[in-house]
């Protein structure tokens, strides 16, 4: 989210504009995550029974996230903002390694690689934008809460192809799930903070 031209002084973008950009970006990331997961699923996961093994296996499962809009509405906006930061930060390492490791998958299509690179870049932009938003809403607080560390790199490098493909499948499955949650939380936060919940 390049908010102001470089070198500009006293450049101030409204909180509403920051949220508009964040919501658009999160929607785009979720779209890419879904496309990449579906493409991987069709190409590599058919008939392997991955979906039955993938339930609740995400690296950031320790971050308690509301499951639906009703639950999210019960959470104070400051806590929800910090939760969004925590989830976004928990994806820094996995996305970085996904870009590298996906190139080693046999006959990996360029479209999957391109989406991995794009999601990694856009996640960084969204995180920067969210840090700006948090700085405005909660001055002095950049949400430095503990977030889930990722230790899944060895599983993306396993010699056994089935196990390795399942590790990719699971990571992409979690990415799609989390990007959907972030998208929903940001829409809710925008409604609450910008439109005084009149949405």
From Swiss-Prot:
Signal peptide: none annotated. It comes from the Eukaryota. Keywords: Disulfide bond, Glycoprotein, Hormone, Secreted. Its main location: secreted. The keyword Chaperone does not apply. One of its GO terms (biological process) is positive regulation of receptor signaling pathway via JAK-STAT. The keyword Glycoprotein applies. Glycosylated. Glycans are attached at residue 60. It is found in: Secreted. InterPro entries: 4_helix_cytokine-like_core, Somatotropin/Prolactin, Somatotropin_CS. Gene3D superfamilies: 1.20.1250.10. One of its GO terms (molecular function) is hormone activity. Pfam families: Hormone_1. GO terms for cellular component: extracellular space. Disulfide bonds join 4-11, 58-174, 191-199. Belongs to the somatotropin/prolactin family. This is Prolactin-1. It comes from Alligator mississippiensis.
């Amino acid at each position: 989210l390049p908010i102001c031209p470089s070198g500009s002084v006293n450049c101030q973008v409204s909180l509403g504009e920051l949220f508009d950009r964040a919501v658009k970006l999160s929607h785009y990331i979720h779209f890419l995550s879904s496309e990449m997961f579906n493409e991987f699923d069709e190409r590599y996961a058919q008939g392997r029974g991955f979906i039955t093994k993938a339930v609740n296996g995400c690296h950031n499962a320790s971050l308690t996230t509301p499951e639906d809009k009703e639950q999210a509405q019960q959470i104070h906006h400051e806590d929800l903002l910090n939760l969004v930061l925590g989830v976004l930060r928990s994806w820094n390492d996995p996305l970085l390694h996904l870009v590298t490791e996906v190139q080693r998958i046999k006959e990996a299509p360029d479209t999957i690689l391109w989406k991995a690179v794009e999601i990694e870049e856009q996640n960084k932009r969204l995180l920067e934008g969210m840090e700006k938003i948090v700085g405005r809403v909660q001055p002095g607080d950049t949400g430095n809460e503990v977030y889930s560390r990722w230790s899944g790199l060895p599983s993306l490098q396993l010699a056994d192809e089935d196990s390795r493909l399942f590790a990719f499948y699971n990571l992409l499955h979690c990415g799609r799930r989390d990007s959907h949650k972030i998208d929903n939380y940001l829409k809710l936060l925008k409604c609450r903070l910008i439109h005084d919940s009149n949405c």
